[in-house]
């Protein structure tokens, strides 16, 4: 027997073909959300308050300090929040201390800071009753970046950017003449040396002493001449910089000093964040920069004088290991520079400096200047950073240092929920700070309390804005559990502070070698967002700095054996190592079998001897995301089709009776477990009671846990969200075990589709171009039947003319239409409704006339319907018919919170049972998608030799050109699994190979080619060739024909052009575009074309007259002028062109005469004419009433 048995949960055993030992369990798949939010509650919030507080007033009399905060119990449970359209949130209370420095009085007070949305256990938020997900964002990390460009004359220019988390950008660049410039905050450039002078190093000699006689520096000093000799060099530089930053304002050295200080060295205005400080220190420290350089001086121990490294030594790893402890010391090779008193910062600056030889001219000595030892707590930039980064920049021309790749995942980091929330909260708090300062100066200092100073409005508003309308706060994709899980693990490069679709080039979207094990190279949307929206790889985790780490098995450096010690590496750490592939064959003791090993180093794939290998992959599936890891035989599919397969699994509709795949990958259990749709046991114990709605588990400590299941709830996508117990009374359950399946799950595994018998053969041309031929059995036995629940709402509001009323008494409606309404006019649960049926009877007052006193009295006594009302009932929309599943009524009397002006709200849920039908979209897991073209009676389908009819026929032409051969392998293995009565697991890149597949086929007693003779169901004759028949997992996707099919009868028209609207949602028409008009012109179908462009479109009068003619059975009159032509004429007239329309007799045609449009009449005679028309009209009306209300004339109809 090929393969071995593996248990997935307690309810499923699969035969696994994996050969590679599982060294590491997958992490919790939604921890990127939950951990980040937990960090925010534990630390992030406090950090924010500590940043903003204490707040002092302008005179320094009062100060407001932060003491602590607490979140109280949430007002609603998760379920109640869903029902009430409310937020699942908890009140945030902050303790503040107000100190009066004049009197020494201290007041402490608890201040309510608004309701703060809480994250559910599943990693989502409930905002206004809907589940939302905050997508993590991929952004450039703050830090120092160096880049180079080659111009058309092959000259290399260099550039540097210092990117903060917030604050001004600092950029250095060289031009074609090698002069170095600096830009502050994207303004005009000034010579680099001016910034050095402004920092307090005024003379040329000071600058040369610090940086050495670099060519570019010398050229820059020549350009930077002393223009105004009255000022010192430092003052002149300061004024120059001020002029660039604030052009047009009077410049003084003092104002420039304070401006520069505020731009870069003020922690309130400039923030690198902890990650920025970490990146800057890492880039500028001598530890990283000395590696592979040749020393131009001898380095000795400062205490003993013992030589550590001789002059001329090349610093390799061994030398660096000796040097590292010294480089961490404050007294090793440290030079202190004292800026002049005129500089921006006057404190002494400590730099670490070591001489090395140039890579370009080998005997030239170069200063390497590091930024010293700046603590993690310093979140702003300091002069040492500026000088060290300038030194790095100048040294690039000498071949020292490296250029940064912006798409490298060491330079891109993830902002998860916690950080995004923190940034939003900071915005709210800083707005609040301004208000507090103003109030401090206004209020009486003796009596003021913290409560009076605080205005929480800006804080509440910024949080509400973030959850309600941020690009990263998204309505959760709840089609099935995999869609949910993937949405929470999504990484987006879009959003505030990120890229925009149109600006993102090819490089950003492309797969980068650092994606390996961190981001999935396959799962990304097709279309404009390709490569900008990615998915976290299955084993990847996010470290505290926001960089993605992936696990590797450590290879012992002395024995060269692979150990089970796991290290998580970021992308830039991994660049230092050589990593072997997960499928490298190992001996039992962990040593490599082969003489050479396939390995990766940076972006190279290399063959190398085992003693050079540092790490080894933990698993072959660490490269891909969860959805991709659910595709069996992924290694045999072309990547484009695998991309479609991964994306389409998320669109699979949960079926009534789901089945887990016969051929799985072993990922199904973990995906279902972590998605949050299943019910997990919180504690171990024994099941005491089970029914469809509740499971009760007796814990080991004697307490009882009750788990309520969700039954037939509507998911965000309008699908049926239903949970079913999979345990029975007496079962023992463990902590975290699945005790109830969610939607699209079976026995604790993901079950997105079914396992039908599929034949690759054409059938009467019905499966041409990816069409699918289905057997009627799939319809009859409800194999692909799904339940859909739609929610409809009706509100009774107060209007100016009186309140709307929910009632059975609806004007002009027969008893037949009211048969399913109760006494209040609300439809009963269980009623079957069709399109156009009334769900909630509602009338709105028309209020034509004001009631007289007598009428009001009569109305008060007898409650007579003296008032005119309009029927504004809620009706079933087109295609919305089904069975009423639930009705919820919310009223003020019952204590429900309703929006202002609403007296009552009724919510009706309609359930539809949709069987598979022609037009529905289906797909396998390999990107093999199609639409159903015909449903064939079971007896007409081709059948196997044992008489079993095939369920689906797919076109064999869909395979070769698309190169997704995985589907064929799955087909054969699926058939073998069915015959053997087993489920199999074939993990990605480590699944069943050729030998395993054919061994299993043989074991199942199938033919050696895996094919079968098929017989035509209509004639009973065998087909000429043997056909590939087997079991393939096939899903029904949420693109169903019922949601798309649409036809217009009489519907709304666009306001300006008077043409019918478009689209199903607007009940619109089909667009007859320019090319369709050409087609009719080519056929000479003049009359057809004329009516399409007039009656059926925007000839307003013609429409009405045509309708009238059809009703009366008269011939249809000639069409008039289309409204859009009038719009064109009016637009030309508006441009001042005297546009007139002439008839065939060259006489002007008055457009308004043609269609009786009174609105355009301005002149006095025209008004007189209008009055005469009105008189005539009244006479007509009287005559019409006399002849027993025959149809009114067309102008009146139009009115």
Curated annotation (Swiss-Prot):
Residues 1175-1199 are annotated as: Disordered. GO terms for biological process: DNA-templated transcription. It catalyses: RNA(n) + a ribonucleoside 5'-triphosphate = RNA(n+1) + diphosphate. Disulfide bonds: none annotated. Residues 1188-1199 have a biased composition (Polar residues). InterPro entries: DNA-dir_RNA_pol_bsu_ext_1_sf (IPR042107), DNA-dir_RNA_pol_bsu_external_1 (IPR019462), DNA-dir_RNA_pol_su2 (IPR015712), DNA-dir_RNAP_su2_dom (IPR007120), DNA-dir_RNAP_su2_hyb_sf (IPR037033), RNA_pol_bsu_bac (IPR010243), RNA_pol_bsu_CS (IPR007121), RNA_pol_bsu_protrusion (IPR007644). One of its GO terms (molecular function) is DNA-directed RNA polymerase activity. It is an enzyme of class 2 (transferase). GO terms for cellular component: DNA-directed RNA polymerase complex. The RNAP catalytic core consists of 2 alpha, 1 beta, 1 beta' and 1 omega subunit. When a sigma factor is associated with the core the holoenzyme is formed, which can initiate transcription. DNA-dependent RNA polymerase catalyzes the transcription of DNA into RNA using the four ribonucleoside triphosphates as substrates. Belongs to the RNA polymerase beta chain family. This is DNA-directed RNA polymerase subunit beta. It comes from Lacticaseibacillus paracasei (strain ATCC 334 / BCRC 17002 / CCUG 31169 / CIP 107868 / KCTC 3260 / NRRL B-441) (Lactobacillus paracasei).
């Amino acid at each position: 027997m090929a393969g071995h048995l593996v248990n997935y949960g307690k309810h499923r055993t699969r035969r696994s073909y994996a050969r590679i030992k599982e060294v590491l369990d997958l992490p919790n798949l939604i921890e990127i959300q939950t951990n980040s939010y937990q960090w925010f509650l534990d630390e992030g919030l406090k950090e924010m308050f500590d940043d903003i507080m204490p707040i002092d007033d302008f005179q320094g009399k009062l100060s407001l300090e932060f003491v602590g905060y607490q979140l109280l119990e949430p007002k609603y449970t998760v379920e109640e929040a869903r029902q009430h359209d409310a937020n699942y949130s908890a009140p945030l209370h902050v303790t503040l201390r107000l100190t009066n420095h004049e009197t020494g009085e201290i007041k402490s007070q608890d201040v309510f800071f608004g309701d703060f949305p809480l994250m559910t256990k599943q990693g989502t938020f409930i905002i206004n009753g809907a589940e939302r997900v905050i997508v993590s964002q991929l952004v450039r990390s703050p830090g120092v970046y160096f880049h180079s460009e080659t111009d058309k004359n092959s000259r290399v220019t260099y550039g540097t950017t210092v990117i903060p988390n917030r604050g001004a950008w600092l950029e250095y660049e060289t031009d074609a003449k090698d002069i170095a410039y600096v830009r502050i905050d994207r303004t005009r450039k000034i010579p680099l040396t001016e910034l050095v002078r402004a920092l307090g190093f005024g003379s040329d000699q000071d600058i040369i002493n610090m940086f050495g006689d670099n060519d570019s520096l010398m050229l820059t000093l020549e350009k930077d001449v002393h223009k105004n000799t009255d000022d010192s060099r430092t003052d002149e530089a300061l004024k120059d910089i001020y002029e660039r930053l604030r052009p047009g304002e009077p410049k003084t050295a003092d104002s420039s000093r304070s401006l520069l200080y505020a731009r870069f060295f003020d922690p309130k205005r400039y923030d690198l964040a902890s990650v920025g400080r970490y990146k800057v220190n890492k880039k500028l420290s001598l530890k990283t920069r000395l590696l592979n350089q040749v020393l131009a001086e001898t380095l000795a121990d400062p205490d003993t004088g013992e030589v550590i490294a001789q002059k001329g030594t090349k610093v390799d790893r061994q030398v660096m290991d000796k040097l590292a402890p010294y480089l961490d010391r404050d007294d090793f090779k440290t030079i202190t520079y004292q800026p002049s008193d005129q500089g921006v910062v006057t404190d002494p600056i400590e730099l670490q400096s070591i001489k090395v030889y140039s890579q370009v001219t080998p005997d030239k000595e170069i200063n390497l200047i590091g930024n010293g030892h700046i603590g993690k707590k310093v979140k702003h930039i300091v002069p040492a950073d500026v000088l060290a980064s300038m030194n790095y920049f100048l040294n690039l021309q000498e071949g020292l240092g490296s250029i940064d790749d912006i798409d490298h995942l060491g330079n891109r980091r993830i902002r998860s929920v916690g950080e995004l929330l923190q940034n939003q909260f900071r915005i709210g708090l800083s707005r609040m700070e301004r208000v507090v300062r103003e109030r401090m100066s206004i209020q009486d200092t003796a009596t003021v309390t913290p409560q009076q100073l605080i205005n929480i409005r800006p804080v509440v508003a910024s949080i509400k804005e973030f959850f309600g309308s941020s690009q990263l706060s998204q309505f959760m994709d709840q089609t099935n559990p995999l869609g949910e899980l993937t949405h929470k693990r999504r990484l987006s490069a879009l959003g505030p502070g990120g890229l925009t679709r149109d600006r993102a080039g090819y490089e950003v979207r492309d797969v980068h070698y650092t994606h390996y094990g961190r981001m999935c190279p396959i799962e990304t949307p097709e279309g404009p967002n390709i490569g900008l929206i990615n998915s976290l790889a299955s084993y990847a985790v996010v470290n505290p700095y926001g960089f993605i780490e992936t696990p590797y098995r450590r290879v012992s450096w002395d024995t060269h054996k692979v150990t089970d010690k796991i290290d998580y590496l970021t992308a830039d750490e991994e660049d230092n190592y050589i990593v072997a592939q997960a499928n490298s064959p190992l001996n039992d003791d962990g040593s490599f079998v082969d003489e050479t090993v396939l390995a990766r180093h940076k972006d190279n794939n290399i063959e190398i001897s085992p003693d050079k290998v540092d790490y080894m992959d933990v698993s072959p599936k660490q490269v891909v995301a969860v959805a991709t890891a659910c595709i069996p035989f992924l290694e045999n599919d072309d990547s484009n089709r695998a991309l479609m397969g991964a994306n389409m699994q998320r669109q699979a509709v949960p079926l009534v009776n789901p089945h887990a795949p016969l051929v799985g990958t072993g990922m199904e259990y973990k995906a279902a477990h972590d998605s949050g749709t299943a019910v997990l046991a919180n504690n171990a114990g024994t099941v005491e009671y089970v029914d469809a709605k509740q499971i009760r588990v007796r814990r080991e400590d004697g307490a009882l846990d009750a788990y309520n299941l969700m039954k037939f709830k509507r998911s965000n996508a309008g699908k049926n969200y239903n949970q079913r117990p999979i345990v029975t009374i007496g079962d023992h359950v463990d902590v975290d075990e699945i005790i109830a399946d969610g939607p699209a799950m079976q026995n604790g595994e993901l079950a997105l589709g079914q396992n039908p018998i599929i034949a690759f053969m054409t059938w009467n041309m019905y499966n041409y171009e990816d069409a699918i031929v289905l057997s009627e059995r799939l319809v009859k036995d409800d194999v692909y039947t799904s339940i859909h629940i739609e929610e409809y709402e009706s509100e009774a509001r107060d209007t100016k003319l009186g309140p709307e009323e929910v009632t059975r008494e609806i004007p002009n409606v027969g008893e037949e239409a009211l048969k399913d309404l109760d006494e209040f006019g609300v439809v009963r649960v269980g009623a079957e409704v069709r399109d156009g049926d009334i769900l909630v009877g509602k009338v709105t007052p028309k209020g034509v006339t004001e009631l007289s006193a007598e009428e009001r009295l009569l109305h008060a006594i007898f409650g007579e319907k003296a008032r005119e009302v309009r029927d504004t009932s809620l009706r079933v929309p087109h295609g919305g018919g089904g069975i009423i599943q639930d009705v919820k009524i919310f009223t003020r009397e019952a204590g429900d919170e309703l929006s202002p002006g609403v007296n009552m709200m009724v919510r009706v849920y309609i359930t539809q049972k949709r069987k598979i039908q022609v037009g529905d979209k289906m797909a396998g897991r390999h990107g093999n998608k199609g639409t159903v073209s015909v449903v064939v009676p079971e007896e007409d389908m081709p059948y196997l030799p044992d008489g079993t009819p095939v369920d689906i026929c797919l076109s064999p032409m869909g395979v070769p050109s698309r190169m997704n051969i995985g589907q064929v392998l799955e087909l054969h293995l699926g058939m073998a699994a069915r015959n053997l009565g087993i489920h199999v697991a074939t993990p990605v890149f480590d699944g069943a190979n050729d030998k395993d597949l054919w061994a299993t086929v043989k074991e199942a007693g199938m033919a050696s080619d895996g094919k079968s003779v098929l017989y035509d169901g209509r004639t009973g004759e065998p087909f000429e060739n043997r056909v590939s028949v087997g079991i393939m997992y096939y899903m029904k996707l949420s693109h169903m024909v019922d949601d798309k099919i649409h036809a217009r009868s009489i519907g709304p028209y666009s306001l300006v052009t008077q043409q019918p609207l478009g689209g199903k949602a607007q009940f619109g028409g089909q667009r007859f575009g320019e090319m369709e008009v050409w087609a009719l012109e080519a056929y000479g179908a003049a009359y057809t074309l004329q009516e399409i462009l007039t009656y059926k479109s925007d000839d307003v009068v013609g429409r009405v007259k045509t309708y009238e003619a059809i009703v009366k059975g008269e011939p249809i009159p000639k069409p008039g002028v289309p409204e859009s032509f009038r719009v064109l004429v009016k637009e030309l007239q508006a441009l001042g062109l005297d546009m007139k329309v002439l008839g065939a007799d060259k006489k002007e045609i008055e457009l308004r005469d043609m269609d009786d449009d009174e609105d355009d009449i301005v002149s006095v005679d025209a008004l007189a004419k209008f009055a005469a028309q009105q008189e005539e009209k009244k006479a007509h009306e009287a005559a019409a009433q006399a002849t027993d209300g025959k149809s009114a004339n067309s102008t009146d109809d139009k009115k």
